[in-house]
Amino acid sequence: MKNFVAIDFETANYEPTSICSVGLVVARGGEITQRMHRLVCPEPDYYIRRFSEQVHGIYPADTCGAPTFDAVWSEIVPWVEGLPFVAYNKAFDERVLRAACRMYGIDYTYGTFLCTLRQARRVIPRTSIANYRLPTVCAYLGIPFDRHHYALADAEGCARIALRLWGDEE
């Protein structure tokens, strides 16, 4: 697979609609061609302190005045038209995307959504790796990675994993 959009969301709280950050990395022809990161005003607009302090480092002041997801999505759509999504742990990111689209009345018609975590578990023997966390899989595959839970870094790590594990597939 050489053409896709890697996507990663960070949320402010346990609600899947509470997107506070989105990262996208577009691959075409087996090369990364575009990157996008946006802060998003979450809905509902409250933060769980642990998420801010221990997970993504995004605080209410960071998203005060940021656009809501529907405005950000209108900017994203031209990038994703006709391309499959990939995510590391797609169960989370697809649930977040579907919930936000439902909440904002956005027609969600993007069918293919693949999981690089699932593919890593299929391809990398359990005895060869300490765990299947995103930073660990990147390290195992020799992919530079830092700033875990920064949406753009996670999307880029996911994209590079997809290119490595599915790169020869059409």
Where are the regions a protein language model picked out?
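Conserved non-catalytic scaffold segment of RNase H-like nuclease domains
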Residues: 1-104, 108-110, 131-149
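Acidic two-metal-ion nuclease catalytic site recognized across multiple nuclease folds
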Residues: 139-140, 159-170
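Short, conserved phosphate/pyrophosphate- and ester-handling motifs at nucleotide-, phospho-/glycolipid
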Residues: 154
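Short alpha-helix plus adjacent loop in nuclease-associated cores
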Residues: 114-131
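Amphipathic alpha-helical interaction segments
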Residues: 95-96, 157-160
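Short Asp/Glu-rich motifs
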Residues: 72, 120, 157-158
